[in-house]
């Protein structure tokens, strides 16, 4: 009994494979923390859309680049990254039109789709009422943000996202759901939220097995939204 308790205590004290304070444990990689970190992939540097494609047909992205930002050209379609990603840290800055037009979901609407499937809502949510799971910072249709720290129309705002993709078993069944943590303008708004499946409008589709890496997508929802300083770090 004493031996059993001792072994239990040891397993609780050192739950990982390395002994506490082991000098043999692999060191974390050293990165420059400047904007962006030195190990980040810059998806948009304010100059061109070489890292992006049209989602519809994989042709060159058709949004407008000017003055260090890219602006949605309504009607040209959603834009997808040229490469795929799974677990990531994402930084992206966005701004709604300076002159607010429309109400609810019609005002400054776009979306950031992790793996092209899991949407983090982009919306002008400054003094603009809509359903809570559709406002800025919501995991669309699933979870409202914890708080609303949005700025007024035309002001630059920033998302910092930690996303962990879902894991699937060999038979296609779900092993672990996707998880998302989000800061908006430095304020925590999604705290390791477990997604119940792909995001969708007025429906809740189940998880379906998909590749471990898929493109990031930025949505054309008919509003001239702006984005800048987009970088991403692979976490796997």
Model-predicted regions and their roles:
Residues 2-10:
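Sec-dependent N-terminal signal peptides
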Residues 12-236:
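Carbohydrate-interacting regions of secretory-pathway proteins
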